[in-house]
Each structure stands twice: as structure tokens, then as C-alpha cells.
């Protein structure tokens, strides 16, 4: 039995210099699992609650000592002696201990740190790499990365309203070659920006954050970078957007301040459709406000056959909300953020529900990250097919890419890279 004999929670810092939660779980055999949780900047209103201290004189109120204390007291007492290999039972124990719908009592950050650390300890105990522990012998598909090479919105201090402009390498035979493609486009873009006298400073997720005059100008420049790096836009590399539309939806209008536009749901749908006609855009995330389900339906009806429409703030990795979206024909993909829901069991349930409905599942980081690379193992372990984990800079982003390289190496000849077939929702 892989009995849990010790649990240690601690406060560490994330990639933005804000506190987050880390947890160590020690088993009877002496094996240990360690996990750290991420934190978002643009968050959905229905996400599980991240417990912060609210003490203004310490880390601006963002400390997590309360969450850490919950790990070291209540949670420790509840799961001490449990079998670490019984993940579903352990997560159920955490949910019952918290007793709220949104994990507001113990904090999703406390619960997730424990859930992840237990899984890592159990994998170590079993002598399995984490991806194999999650997925068994069927885990062999590397994910197609969506690489955020230009940051805007809440992730950068510039005039771009759309939060993320991403490149998606799809023609390469392996993940290693896809990663090389992304890195080469990233460096080509840096040279173009530098030659124009534009900023090459990076945002929270490692992408550049220059002041483009419009979203159109930004996308055109990315196409130039793809060509400069020796690749073909629309063939070797596709584009993806994260609008994070909830961030610029005010008074019933989508207010693109950078372009001086105020658009209705129908008008913003047309705006996005025009971009998708002009550029090789394969995926649009959060193209409408999380509560604008009528707008989402309009967007899905217009673009859902040719563009992946990803619900992030819309679904918040929650099976109850996802089920409603599937029934109503809203979006065709879900973004999976482990800290939006707070346990691995619930995360995996959301991925499986999406797949059964023909929706894709995109495994995602948060803008506030750590060196923890668990999401890379989740992406492969559950054969998710897609991952979104930032740009080609900042070690908090690169740690996930490097872990995927290791996994591909470990898989050897049975490793596969899906390319365009990862977008099975567009068939």
C-alpha cells in the first residue's frame, strides 16, 4: 500500500512574483511527490476559488498562508494514511472536506497542490513516468502546441485588445520539429520587431508585447515572421487567437479600445469571421463574454465548422457547464486549466466529457506559472492532442516544452505527433 505518511504545504512565488502554493507528499516507502499550482490574470467568474490571505501589508493581500495552513492541518489529518494510488477516492475526500460548490473554504489552490503531489508520489512509487501513470499504455500522442508569441490584453501593457496571438505548427513529423519551428518563427519575429524599432520586451507568457496599431497589423507581421523563418503560413504553421472577450465586454458591447470600436455580439462575430477569412486562423478562444451565450451561439453557428472555438472563461473546466454547452451547441472545444476546477479527477472528467461529445480539449497553463510541468504529462497521458503553454521564452513556459521533449524521447518509435488531425472537431 502506498500510504501517505507526511504532507507539507508551503508558500512559494510564481512567475509574476506573486505567492502560490506548493505541496510535498511523502509515502511510506520514502517516495515523494511535489507540486506547485499556477494562477491566472484573466479569470472566469465561475472558476473554483483561489484562496488568498487578503492581508494588505503582506504581498499586497496576495499571500497564501491560509491555504498552506489548510494543507498542513485539516487536509493532512483527512488524508494521512490513505493510499496514494487511489486518486479518485483521495480527491473525493478533499471535495467532501471542503464542502462548498466552488472550493472557497479550503481553497482550490490548496486542494490542487495536494491532488497533484499525491499523483506524482504514486507515479514515483509505481516506477512510472507521470504521463504513463495517468494514461497507461495508450499514452503515446504528443500535443500540438499553440505558442503565444504576441501578448496583449491583460497579459501585456500595450494597445492590443486581443490577449494572445499564437502560432500552431502542424506539418512537422515530430513534436521536436514542431518546437524548433515555433522557436525559429519566434526569433524571426523578434528580428522584424527590432528592425522596425518596436519593443521586444515580453509579457507574462513570454510573447512579445509591442504596440501594433491593430489586430490585423499584428497578424500580418506574424505571417511575415513565418515566411522569414522559412515556413508556409496556412500549410506548415496556422494561427490561433485568445480574445479573452470577457475582459473588454462592457455595457453590452465588445469595446476594442485599441481600434476605437464598440461592437454588438453579431458585429464582433463578423469581425472575427473577417479575420478568419483573411488569415489562416484555426482556433479562437473566448470569442465572446462568458455570459453571452446568445453571442456564443451566433459565433458557433457562423464559424464552428471551420474554426476551433474554445471555451475557457465560458466552461472553466467544469463538467456541469460543459454539459450545458454541449447540449446547446455552444463552442466546439474546451480549455483545460487544472486550477479552474481544483482536482485532477475533475480535470480528467472534463477532458473525457469533451472527447465523447466530439469537442477537443486544449490543456493550458496560466499566466502566473511555476517550473511545475505536470500539464505536459496530462496532455500526453490523456492523449489530449493540443497544449497551450506560452511562448518560446521564460523558463516557466519552456519547462513544459522541455518535458514534452523528454516524453517524446521516452516514447521512442511509438510517439506520434497529430498535426492538423488534432483539430478533429473541424471535420
Curated annotation (Swiss-Prot):
It is an enzyme of class 4 (lyase). The active site is at residues 205, 337. It is found in: Cytoplasm; Secreted; Cell surface. Its cofactor is Mg(2+). GO terms for biological process: glycolytic process. SMART domains: Enolase_C, Enolase_N. GO terms for molecular function: magnesium ion binding; phosphopyruvate hydratase activity. It comes from the Bacteria. Keywords: Cytoplasm, Glycolysis, Lyase, Magnesium, Metal-binding, Secreted. The keyword Secreted applies. Binds a second Mg(2+) ion via substrate during catalysis. Its main location: cytoplasm. PROSITE patterns: ENOLASE (PS00164). Pathway: Carbohydrate degradation; glycolysis; pyruvate from D-glyceraldehyde 3-phosphate: step 4/5. It catalyses: (2R)-2-phosphoglycerate = phosphoenolpyruvate + H2O. Mg(2+) binds at residues 242, 285, 312. Catalyzes the reversible conversion of 2-phosphoglycerate (2-PG) into phosphoenolpyruvate (PEP). It is essential for the degradation of carbohydrates via glycolysis. HAMAP family: Enolase. This is Enolase. It comes from Paraburkholderia xenovorans (strain LB400). The gene is eno.
Amino acid at each position: 500500500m502506498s500510504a501517505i505518511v507526511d504532507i507539507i504545504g508551503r508558500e512559494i512565488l510564481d512567475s509574476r512574483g506573486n505567492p502560490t502554493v506548493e505541496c510535498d507528499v511523502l509515502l511510506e516507502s520514502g517516495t515523494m511527490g511535489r507540486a506547485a499550482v499556477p494562477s491566472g490574470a484573466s479569470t472566469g467568474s465561475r472558476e473554483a476559488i483561489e484562496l488568498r490571505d487578503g492581508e494588505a501589508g503582506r504581498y499586497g493581500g496576495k499571500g497564501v498562508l491560509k491555504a498552506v495552513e489548510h494543507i498542513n492541518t485539516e487536509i493532512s489529518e483527512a488524508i494521512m494514511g490513505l493510499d496514494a494510488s487511489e486518486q479518485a477516492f483521495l480527491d473525493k475526500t478533499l471535495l467532501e472536506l471542503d464542502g462548498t460548490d466552488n472550493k472557497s473554504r479550503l481553497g482550490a489552490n490548496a486542494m490542487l497542490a495536494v491532488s497533484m503531489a499525491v499523483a506524482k508520489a504514486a507515479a514515483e512509487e509505481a516506477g512510472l513516468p507521470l504521463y504513463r501513470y495517468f494514461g497507461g499504455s495508450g499514452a503515446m500522442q504528443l500535443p500540438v502546441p499553440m505558442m503565444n508569441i504576441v501578448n496583449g490584453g491583460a497579459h501585456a501593457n500595450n494597445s492590443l485588445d486581443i490577449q494572445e496571438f499564437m502560432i500552431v505548427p502542424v506539418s512537422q513529423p515530430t513534436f521536436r520539429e514542431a518546437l524548433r519551428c515555433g522557436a525559429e518563427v519566434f526569433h524571426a519575429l523578434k528580428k522584424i520587431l527590432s528592425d522596425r524599432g518596436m519593443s521586444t520586451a515580453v509579457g507574462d507568457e513570454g510573447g512579445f508585447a509591442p504596440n501594433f496599431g491593430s489586430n490585423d497589423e499584428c497578424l500580418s507581421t506574424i505571417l511575415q515572421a513565418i515566411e522569414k523563418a522559412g515556413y508556409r503560413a496556412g500549410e506548415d504553421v496556422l494561427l490561433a487567437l485568445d480574445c479573452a472577450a470577457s475582459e473588454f465586454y462592457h455595457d453590452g458591447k465588445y469595446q476594442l479600445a485599441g481600434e476605437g470600436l464598440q461592437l454588438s455580439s453579431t458585429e464582433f462575430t463578423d469581425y472575427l469571421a473577417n479575420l478568419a477569412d483573411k488569415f489562416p486562423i484555426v482556433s479562437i478562444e473566448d470569442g465572446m463574454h462568458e455570459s453571452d451565450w446568445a453571442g456564443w451561439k451566433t459565433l458557433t453557428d457562423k464559424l464552428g465548422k471551420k474554426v476551433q472555438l474554445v471555451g475557457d472563461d465560458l466552461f472553466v473546466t467544469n463538467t456541469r457547464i460543459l454539459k450545458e454547452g454541449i447540449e446547446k451547441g455552444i463552442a466546439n472545444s474546451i480549455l483545460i486549466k487544472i486550477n479552474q476546477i481544483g482536482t485532477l479527477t475533475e480535470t480528467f472528467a472534463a477532458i473525457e466529457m469533451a472527447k465523447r461529445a466530439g469537442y477537443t480539449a486544449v490543456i493550458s497553463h496560466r499566466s502566473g506559472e511555476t517550473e511545475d510541468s505536470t500539464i505536459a504529462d496530462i496532455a500526453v497521458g490523456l492523449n489530449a492532442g493540443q497544449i497551450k503553454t506560452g511562448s518560446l521564452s521564460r523558463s516557466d513556459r519552456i519547462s513544459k516544452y522541455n518535458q514534452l521533449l523528454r516524453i517524446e524521447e521516452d516514447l521512442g518509435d511509438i510517439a506520434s505527433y497529430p498535426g492538423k488531425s488534432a483539430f478533429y472537431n473541424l471535420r
